[in-house]
Amino acid sequence: TKKPVLHDITFSAKRGETVAIIGSTGCGKSTLIQLIPRFYDVTEGSIKIDGVDVRNYDLETLRNKIGFIPQKTILFSGTIADNMRFGKHDANEKELIEAAKVAQAYDFIMDKPDQFDEMVYEGGTNMSGGQKQRMSIARAVIRNPEIYIFDDSFSALDFKTDAILRAELKKETTHAIVLIVAQRIGSIMDADKIIVLDEGNVVGIGKHKELLKTCSVYKEIALSQLTEEELA
C-alpha cells in the first residue's frame, strides 16, 4: 500500500490570523492547502470551515469563500481589467484600483500605455514573473474572500516588494484567515503561527523565534537562508 503524503496533522486557524506552512521540497505543503478548496479530498480525518466539513459544502459555495493564489499564475488574453475581474465579475473601477494597490501592481499597470485596458497575451507572456504573481494576488484581493491561500505566491517577488505587499495584505485581511505556503523564511517570519512539515509530518508549530530554538528542521532552513543579524 502507498503511504499517505500527509499524516497526523492537526491545526486550527482563526479569522485575522496568518498561518504559514514551510518545509523541504516534497514534504506535502501544497497538498495540505489543496485539501481546503477540495482539489483533493482527505482519506481520513476532516477539514472544517466554520465548524462544517468542507465535503458538506456545495463546491461553488466552498470555493467562493476562498481566494487561492497558485504557484503558477494563469492569465488569459484580454485586458488587465478582464484578468482581474476573473476574481469578481462585477468589480468596479474603484475596486480594481484598490486591489491593484494592495497587490503592488498599481504602479506597473499605470506605466502601461493603456493602463487597466492594456492587453495581456495568452499566458501573460508580455509580463514578468513578478508582475504575473501580483496580478494573481490582485485577483484574489478583489474577491474579498474569507480565506486566502497563497501557494508559494511570493517567490518571484524581490524582498522589498514582498515585504510591502505582505504589510498591505495584513491591513486588508483582518477579517480573513491567511494561509501561506513558502520556501522562503523571509516571507513568513512574522506569521502568527508557522507549521513546519517534514516528510508529511508536523515537526514544529510556533512563532519564528520559538521555532529557531525548538525545531531543528526550521533552524536548518533558517541557517541556510538568513544572515546572522536576521537570526539574532
Regions of interest found by a model, annotated:
Residues T1-A232:
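ABC-type nucleotide-binding domain
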